[in-house]
Amino acid sequence: MKTLCIILGSLCTFYFIGIAVYAGLSSLFPCIWAAGGVFFYGIAVFLHLNRKHGMLSGFAFPAVLKHGLLVLAVLCVLVFVAVEALIFTGMFHKPSKDLDYIIVLGAQVNGTKLSNSLRLRVERAGEYLEENPEACAVLSGGKGTGEDITEAEAMYRYLVKKGVSPDRLLKEEHSTNTSENLKFSLKIIDTEEDGKGKEASIGVVTNNFHVYRGVALGKKLGCSHIEGIPSKSNTFLQVNYLVREFFGVVKDKAAGNMSVSYTHLTLPTTPYV
């Protein structure tokens, strides 16, 4: 047990260091890996001291408490695995052709430059627009900390520079999170479709780990023809993204923003990563 804790603590610690060196700490979430390292190392030290000095000799946990903690731990693991399985369904989705609209979800902009995650989303959107010339795109994202322009404007400039006609691009520049991305973008589509936006076929373009939540949010808002268009994501950071997305799904479910279902699913041979 002590050896296992040392291994897990080392994995968490080195992954945290890797993230800090490779991508920087633009958010606090990667610190969860540092906390995990401290947690597992702490257990290892405690087990070592207990074995050497008998710190818990003569003490026994009440059976009810022991069994209760075990049941709680198992339930937590089962919930985590179940949510991650749902997230994976979005990662493997193969989008339909000739959708009426695609919604490109915003992500961090550094000044006026797209972050790596956002660039991958916009590149995927550009591919879909090129393959489906009748589709229009709603570029969704407001202006956050460290951003000189809105995320929507940054995406717009990138796609126009790549040759996409401005007539096919609509900007949503007020959202600050994924839920608002979908809500505000659907209002724009509703206006374009004279109040019948929910009848349009819509694709949600985002990094593969984020597709499930984006589509589920759209379904909760009443869209019956909505599906995911997964883009690539950074391979090294994928584990961090998947764990972070677990909390995002749980948060939006608890807030009533989404239902836990995903009915539009196609499984190709390999995921779009």
Language-model segments: residues:
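Membrane-embedded alpha-helical segments of integral membrane proteins
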Residues: M1-K52, L242
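Structural signature of transmembrane alpha-helix termini at the membrane-water interface
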Residues: F14-G24, L78-T89, G126, V250, ...
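Transmembrane alpha-helices and immediately adjacent membrane-cytoplasm interface residues
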Residues: H48-L49, A60-G90
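A structural signal for short, hydrophobic/glycine-enriched beta-strand patches
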Residues: L75, A82-L242
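Conserved small/polar residues in nucleotide/adenosyl-binding loops
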Residues: T263-T269
